[in-house]
Amino acid sequence: VYKRQLDDTWRFIVKRMKRDYDRNKRIPADLYEAFVRAAAESGNAWEEAKNASDFSIYAPHLRNMIEMTKQVIGYTDPGKDVYDTLLEQCEEGMDQATIDRLFEEVKTELIPLVEQITAKKMPENPTFHAYADPDAQRRVQWLLLDYIGFRRDAGAVGETEHPFTTNFSSKDVRVTNHYYETEPLSAMFSAIHEGGHAIFEQNVNPEYDNTVAGSCCYMGVHESQSRFYENILGRNINFWKPIYEKLGELLPQFKNVTLEAFEREINRVENSMVRTEADEVTYLSLIHI
C-alpha cells in the first residue's frame, strides 16, 4: 500500500535508507565504536603531523585506519572486494575495473601533456607569496562567496585545518577555509571551490531536507560542481574583471599586478605533492597515483 503511494523520489529514498541500514547493522557495535575513536585520534595526529611537517607522527594512525576500514567494510558487503565496496559507496555502480579503464585512458594523454608544460619553466613572482593579512583574506573570501551566489541567510563560514563544506539542510550549509599568511591564492580558490559545493547544497529541493535525497548522492556530481566553479569559472580572466579592483583594495599587493599577470599565475602548471593545492592539469595525476 505505502509503496504505491510513493513517487519515484521517495521510493529511491526508502530503498537507499534500507540498503544503508542493512549494511550498517552487520557491523559489530564494538568494532564500529573502536573505528570511530581511531578516526578521531587519527584526525588529531594528522593535524599535528601537518603542522610539524613530520609524516612519522601520522604514519601509525594511517596504517591503523586502513586496516580498520578493511574490517568495517568487510562486514557491510561480505564476499565483495573491499575497494569495490568503498568505490560503490562514493559512486554507485562504480568498480575497480571501470576506474582502471578510465585512468588508463586519461594517463595516456595526461602524462605527456604534464611533461610538455612543466618543461617550460614559468618565472616565480614573489608578489603572490608576500604576506597577506588573514583578516584581509577572510574579507576576500566573503567577496568571492557573495560574488558566486553563496546565500548568507542559508549558510555560515568557519575555519579549519583543511577546507570543507557540510550541510544540515538546504537552509544550513557551512563552509570552512584555512588561511596561509604567504599563500593568499590558496584560500581564494578554496573559497571558490567550497562555495561551489555550498551553492549546490543550498539549491537542493527543501522538500528533501534531512533525507538521503537532500544531499548529492554521488560524489562525482558534487565534485564536478565545486571544480566547475574553481577551474572553469575561477581561472578565467573574465571571472575576475568585475572584482579585480576590489581584490586590490583588500590585498594591496595585487594593486601592482596586472589582471593578465594574475591570470597567468592562477593558471600556473607545476608538479605538487598536495592535491588541494594542485593545478587543473596535475590534479588528475595525483588522483591517478
Regions found by a protein language model. Give the residues of each.
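Long, amphipathic alpha-helical stalk/connector segments used for oligomerization, subunit docking
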Residues: 238-287
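Conserved small/polar residues in nucleotide/adenosyl-binding loops
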Residues: 1-5, 287-289
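Active-site recognition of the HExxH zinc-binding catalytic motif
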Residues: 189-202, 226-227
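Post-HEXXH active-site segment of zinc metalloproteases
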Residues: 201-224
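Contiguous, non-catalytic segments that form substrate-binding/exosite surfaces or channel walls
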Residues: 35-186
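Post-HExxH zinc-binding segment in Zn-dependent metallohydrolases
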Residues: 216-253
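Noncatalytic, helix-rich "gating/capping" subdomain that lines the substrate-entry/channel surface
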Residues: 3-59
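Short acidic (Asp/Glu) and glycine-rich catalytic loops that position anionic groups and cofactors
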Residues: 120, 171, 203-210, 265-274, ...
